[in-house]
Each structure stands twice: as C-alpha cells, then as structure tokens.
Amino acid sequence: MDLDTNMSAYIVVEGVVRDKEALARYGSQATPLIKQFGGEILAFGPWEVIYGEAAYHNGMIIRFPDKDTALAWYSAPAYQALLEIRNAALDCRFRLVG
C-alpha cells in the first residue's frame, strides 16, 4: 500500500457522558480551538455497533489537515487547559489515525 504522507489525520473520540452541563462548557470552548487548527468535526453522537462490543456509547470524528496539526491541537496549552472540564464531562479516550 502506497500511503500519501500528506494525508488528513483523524482523531476518533469515544466516550460516556458523566455531566451534560460540563460537556456543554467543554464543547463550547473546544470547538473553536478545533477550527483554529484547521480541524472539522465530521460526526458526533451515539455509536451504532456494527460488530463487536462498544465500551463507550458516544463518539466523535475530527479531521485535521495532517497528523502534526492534530497533535499540535491536542498539545496546545489552550486545549490542555480544558482537560479538567473534559474529564469531568466524559469518561473518554482519544485515538489518532492518519
């Protein structure tokens, strides 16, 4: 397989909501940061299991221009400052592909 080194990168978020109010605060602050780094939320909502078991009930897929940009977003001080709110809002995991 010949992979394009300039391909888009995707962050896949899986989570279970702990606190809907905290989730709303987190989303209102995280979404502009995603856009600031050229990211786009492609899908958000409950998972529909096609095969296997799902440990998490909700998901989100975010596209970034490339892997370096996705990692820069996640490690940005402005995003890292939101982790306390995020962790109160969700039991989650983030994965990167691309």
Language model regions located:
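C-terminal structural segments of small proteins and small subunits
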Residues: 67-95
